[in-house]
């Protein structure tokens, strides 16, 4: 670059001594007078300059963390002592219950497990299952007890109604001796017992009626033999046949009486025609 005759803009052309001096390692800090070279050397680690953005973010994080810590301490100080004791007691009771449940589970299953190996979801599932079992059993018992009470109440009401009911209000069936003997002779005794038992209900009624012998005779009249039936039928057919020729003869007799009159009229007409000719 110098051979071409053009000055390099990155380097100062003046030969001042400031350019050759190294920049200070820690700007704005005064080192103690008796500090050695190894004390002045920078320590290992990444350190950002005050003007760099990395240094600014690091300082911002530290300040935010300090603020949060101070805020928590202030809130703890402002919290009343009674509230602190209550929260500590609740947390202690919860941890004791978890430890006791884990110990009982190890004794019941016979497996030596570390408390730290027990996960929170598994413990919660076990607790929920135990609660469901304890709440489900009483519900079944309560439902069974209610059903039993309802059944007992219904039975008691039926017994009271039957005891209060008077026997005279029920329908009665009076059977005569002849009817009893007839039923025993024709039917089985079990059937009669069932009939009588069915009459104990108020909605059942039985009416027995026997028609008079004049209306319905016991024995039908003997029918005529087939030969007599044929003779009667032939006689019935012959009677209309004899009556029919008599009627035909009566109709033909007037026609025969009118024949000579017709003949006389014809003779008279013929004589008149001859006279005209």
From Swiss-Prot:
UniProt keyword list: Coiled coil, Cytoplasm, Cytoskeleton, Methylation, Nucleus, Phosphoprotein
Source organism superkingdom: Eukaryota
KW Plastid (keyword) present: no
Pfam family, one: CCDC117
Single GO BP term: positive regulation of DNA repair
Sequence positions bearing Phosphoserine: 52
Feature: compositional bias, Basic residues: 58-69
Principal subcellular localisation of the protein: cytoplasm
Organism: Mus musculus (Mouse)
Job description of the protein: Facilitates DNA repair, cell cycle progression, and cell proliferation through its interaction with CIAO2B.
Stated name of the protein: Coiled-coil domain-containing protein 117
Modification sites for Omega-N-methylarginine: 47
Compositional bias segments (type: Low complexity): 26-37
One cellular component term from this protein's GO annotations in UniProt: cytoplasm
